[in-house]
């Protein structure tokens, strides 16, 4: 028994309210009131053995289930202080199962429409679980379309158009270098031809205003000329006395009567 509240009606009288407690009060000592003795019962396998043998050893024993199912009048006389024992095998809820129940055999044909509907929903959920994305991505997220072939970053051989460009550039560079060189040779020849005195030495004070291709003043009398220019200018005068000037055209020999 458990005292809950004390009401003060008079200073000399007290009223105690009490209700059934679900705590094992034997832990606190002997109870104040008399408690009904619980009937003894055997486990279910013992009862099954006795039934199979057909032996009735004595008066039938009252089980807890029968005692719980007694009338409320008998309950009011002797209150039950212990809680009812729950059945651990009782089905609590119907939750959809995601396992393949066809492995356990065929279902009974007495199933209702609701069960068939839930089975269809479960099958739909199972189909979505087995879906896998495609191996190759398609659409705007793909880095390149599938139809375009891959191009090698480092080609194995040199391209065919490079030699043409290189030869063209070499030809242009050679032409560009030969043109000013020939102009400079012609100018140098004309300057040396005009400025050569009778003594055969070139003038040391030659003007250097011909640009970057103008020849430098030479200290020695010999001037270096290309064979092309000498052939063009001095092709007619091959015979004659040798002079130290190779680049300039030699003077005509004087006749003996002069």
Swiss-Prot record:
The entry's keywords: Cytoplasm, Cytoskeleton, Neurogenesis, Notch signaling pathway, Nucleus
Provide a Gene Ontology MF annotation, just one: tubulin binding
Q: Where is this region: Interaction with tubulin?
A: 145-258
| Superkingdom of the source species | Eukaryota
**Per the record, GO CC terms?**
centrosome; cytoplasm; nucleus
Specify whether Cell inner membrane is a keyword of the entry.
no
Q: Where is the composition biased (Polar residues)?
A: 71-81, 201-212, 236-245
Motif annotated as Nuclear localization signal, chain positions: 81-97
As for subcellular location, the record says: Cytoplasm; Nucleus; Cytoplasm, Cytoskeleton, Microtubule organizing center, Centrosome
User: Could you give the subunit structure recorded for this chain?
Assistant: Interacts with RBPJ/RBPSUH.
Q: Which family does it belong to?
A: Belongs to the RITA family.
List the protein's name.
RBPJ-interacting and tubulin-associated protein 1
Q: What is the lineage of its organism?
A: Eukaryota, Metazoa, Chordata, Craniata, Vertebrata
